[in-house]
């Protein structure tokens, strides 16, 4: 007997909230494509950036580094330069007709500070392009979804340690960029059900603390109704994960969610304690929940498309996309 397929949004409250809809997918990359590297968040180590650029060149891509990528804010050392400079780099890279993709150099903190300075009208007028990042970049994934209607890639960043050291992480991104039909079924071998079931929906999410921080902002997502919510985090102790998940529950953001896929919880304490929080806060929603899918701050970080419809199967530990991540 197959697992039950959950239909989100059937209760009265959740049904009044807007559904998560599939977004416009950008085109896949071709050999020789120009890729802009930007730093919306924290300062970028130059040696690691160079190593990441070499990997991209090895894929026959043409990476160009935005003007302020190696900046450091004069008084706030956790930022890669001034907010307006970082926002301008992203806007100009996106609006450059020669650029096919924009990949972030690293996370940290800072995307929330610049997201409202980005020229979203110009972004919309320029049309969809490939956008890649994770962690702090969750704020921009949400903005591209809600302000531009573009699907994006929750994937490794150019100067991130996992991208530099793990061949499987590299291959997941490379295949998604060039051969997206080959990676329509996602999930590492260790993935398993935290709560049973099978659900169809549209992917969204990212770093749970950043996803939660968007609550109450002018462009914050009203709900995850009909969505397959992908969550992970780093450096958040179990009680802090409890807090952000409880906030998501109390705010109604999880009303009508179709299913939940969980990635890594690096430096969040013993996994048994983290798992207990995840089960307590998410296990009672009546939707499938898959743990250890292999995305985020993990030794192997799969590229996960956001804004694409698919099926989450808890028993198989997989997310299967209805269409390739890129056209």
Map each language-model feature to its residues.
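Conserved beta-alpha junction segments in alpha/beta enzyme cores
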Residues: 43-55, 198, 202-234
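N-terminal glycine-rich "phosphate-gripper" loop used for MgATP/nucleotide binding
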Residues: 101-117
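Short, acidic/small-residue loops that bind anionic groups at enzyme active sites
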Residues: 118-143, 151-157, 285-289
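Conserved anion/nucleotide-ligand pocket segment
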Residues: 149-212, 216
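Buried hydrophobic positions in well-ordered alpha/beta secondary-structure cores of metabolic enzymes
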Residues: 37, 102, 136, 211, ...
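ATP/nucleoside-binding phosphotransfer catalytic cores, i.e., glycine-rich phosphate-binding loops
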Residues: 262-327
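ATP/NTP phosphate-donor binding region
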Residues: 2-98
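Internal helical hairpin/lid segments
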Residues: 219-274
